[in-house]
């Protein structure tokens, strides 16, 4: 019996010493992202597409951020702010980059990135509409976009003005509301100052009224949860772009030149696009070379308002206002022949581009070339050297633009090689051409959208006809 108990004990001990294998679940593999999905809205300062590619302040920054992260950029445009919010909450997009202002309501829902630029919130009305003296007199007459920062502003104002009411549009964007103002369909709206400045080039009837909020930061929005890594990457990227001057460059590119506004000139330009441009457009396209033909056309308008017989007391003549020596240099015999003038002006402008230093980036070479076209390459080189002595970047248009007016002051031009120049006029000259160019691009895009709409309608009609033809005839 003792022997049997001993055997049983040994068996029990051996069993206890056996290795116990516990099956473990394999860790879930989460692949690294390959693309940055950015939610946005269409708008001239935010994101838009054209025959020249994608553009917009938010688009360019998103493109640079994706490159910084070594990811492929995917832009997703939504119909309204509400859809953007829903896409962020459902995880469809990584970031909202849509020109949205920093507000307490947005901070409650999302994480807010660093400021890209600042805007004023302004009341907008149509020329001829009574000028409002205060917000209290506009009960029920203001229309704004649902979920916009303007709703927050009006809500704050309502606390001290309980009777204040307004209308909200969910399915329209800022540009559509401004178009409705210009058409007289609604009396008042609220817009960002940058949006108003940009759209007044196409809708000169727009007028700026009361400033309801000053210097509101425009920011990107990130998900409220699980976005620590992305936020730290965005902050690091923002500091790099700020130090390198990218933010300042984009501000100058999209906003600086549109601040000057001339109602009469804008109306005249829009009329000239209809009445004069069609006669010369094919010639601009033919001789533009590496230049966007619309920049060449904008330059010609700045020079002569597309008047082939234009003359100046200084001796410049024709559509492109060429001097006699320049005409000889580019092989033009008759400066008053509009087609020869366009050919000569294009050739001369292209030569200016070729002669610029390679250090000037492609995105800014045209502005340097136009300034050279206006006051001469030598004076532009003087301005570049002057910028460098002041610790500025001689290859950045925003910096050279700031010192060009100094060439009119003896204190500065006496130290330059080429002396006095009307640098302030060169700045105005380039800014005007940029505004004209932007207007031509906008009108081109509108025409393209109109043609696309017509094609879609025609396709739908053709499909309907085919469907009807395919149906069996009833006996």
Curated annotation (Swiss-Prot):
InterPro entries: Lysozyme-like_dom_sf (IPR023346), MltF (IPR023703), Solute-binding_3/MltF_N (IPR001638), Transglycosylase_SLT_dom_1 (IPR008258). PANTHER family: MEMBRANE-BOUND LYTIC MUREIN TRANSGLYCOSYLASE F (PTHR35936:SF32). It is found in: Cell outer membrane. This is Membrane-bound lytic murein transglycosylase F. GO terms for cellular component: cell outer membrane. The gene is mltF. It catalyses: Exolytic cleavage of the (1->4)-beta-glycosidic linkage between N-acetylmuramic acid (MurNAc) and N-acetylglucosamine (GlcNAc) residues in peptidoglycan, from either the reducing or the non-reducing ends of the peptidoglycan chains, with concomitant formation of a 1,6-anhydrobond in the MurNAc residue. GO terms for molecular function: peptidoglycan lytic transglycosylase activity. It comes from Shewanella halifaxensis (strain HAW-EB4). In the N-terminal section; belongs to the bacterial solute-binding protein 3 family. In the C-terminal section; belongs to the transglycosylase Slt family. Residues 259-475 are annotated as: LT domain. PROSITE patterns: PROKAR_LIPOPROTEIN (PS51257).
């Amino acid at each position: 019996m003792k022997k049997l108990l001993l055997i049983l004990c040994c068996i029990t001990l051996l069993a206890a010493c056996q290795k116990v294998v516990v099956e473990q679940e394999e860790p879930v593999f989460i692949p690294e992202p390959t693309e940055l999905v950015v939610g946005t809205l269409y708008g001239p300062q935010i994101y838009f597409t054209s025959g020249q590619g994608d553009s917009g302040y938010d688009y360019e920054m998103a493109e640079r951020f994706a490159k910084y992260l070594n990811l492929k950029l995917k832009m997703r445009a939504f119909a309204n702010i509400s859809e953007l919010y829903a896409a962020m909450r459902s995880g469809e997009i990584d970031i909202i980059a849509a020109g949205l202002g920093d507000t307490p309501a947005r901070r409650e829902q999302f994480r807010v990135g660093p400021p890209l630029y600042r805007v004023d919130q302004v009341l907008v009305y149509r020329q001829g509409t009574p000028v409002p003296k205060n917000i209290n007199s506009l009960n029920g007459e203001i229309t704004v976009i649902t979920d916009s920062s303007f709703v927050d502003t009006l809500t704050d104002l309502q606390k001290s003005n309980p009777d204040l009411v307004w209308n909200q549009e969910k399915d329209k964007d800022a540009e559509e509301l401004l178009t409705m103002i210009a058409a007289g369909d609604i009396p008042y709206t609220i817009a960002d100052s940058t949006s108003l400045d940009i759209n007044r080039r196409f809708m000169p009837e727009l007028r700026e009224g009361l400033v309801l909020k000053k210097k509101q930061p425009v920011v990107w929005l990130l998900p409220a949860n699980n976005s620590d890594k992305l936020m730290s990457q965005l902050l690091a990227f923002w500091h790099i772009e700020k130090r390198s001057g990218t933010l300042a460059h984009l501000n100058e590119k999209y906003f600086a030149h549109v601040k000057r506004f001339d109602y009469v000139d804008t109306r005249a330009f829009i009329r000239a696009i209809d009445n004069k441009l069609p006669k010369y457009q094919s010639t601009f396209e033919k001789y533009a070379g590496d230049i966007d033909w619309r920049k060449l056309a904008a330059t010609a308008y700045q020079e002569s308002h597309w008047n082939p017989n234009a003359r100046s007391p200084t001796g410049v003549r024709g559509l492109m206002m060429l001097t006699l020596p320049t005409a000889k240099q580019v092989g033009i015999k008759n400066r008053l022949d509009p087609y020869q003038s366009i050919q000569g002006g294009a050739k001369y402008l292209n030569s200016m581009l070729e002669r610029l230093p390679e250090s000037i980036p492609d995105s800014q070479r045209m502005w340097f070339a136009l300034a050279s076209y206006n006051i001469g390459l030598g004076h532009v080189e003087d301005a570049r050297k002057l910028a460098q002595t002041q610790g500025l970047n001689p290859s950045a248009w925003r910096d050279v633009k700031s010192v060009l007016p100094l060439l009119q002051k003896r204190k500065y031009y006496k130290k330059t090689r080429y002396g006095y120049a009307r640098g302030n006029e060169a700045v105005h000259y380039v800014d005007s051409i940029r505004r004209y160019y932007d207007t031509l691009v906008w009108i081109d895009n509108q025409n393209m959208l109109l043609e696309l709409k017509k094609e879609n309608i025609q396709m739908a009609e053709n499909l309907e006809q085919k469907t009807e033809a395919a149906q069996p005839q009833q006996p």
